[in-house]
């Protein structure tokens, strides 16, 4: 039972997440042979003030 965890900055729409989940599921199925119905995709929406890159919070960028 493959589990794919996706962490993203908050702000994606439900449609965007649905499209990502479908593509990820297809890719995992294609390369692992796991049945689509057992492939799980989870999304973690991270607020800009809770994610940093290079020591700088995303809330401090643009």
Q: PLM features: residue spans?
A:
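A domain-level signal for the structural core that forms small-molecule/cofactor-binding pockets
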Residues: 2-62
């Amino acid at each position: 039972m493959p589990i794919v965890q996706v962490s993203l900055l908050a702000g994606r729409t439900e449609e965007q997440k649905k499209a990502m989940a479908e593509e990820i599921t297809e890719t995992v199925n294609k390369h692992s042979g796991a049945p689509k119905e057992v492939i799980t995709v989870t999304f973690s929406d991270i607020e800009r003030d809770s994610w940093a890159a290079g020591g700088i919070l995303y809330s401090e960028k643009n």
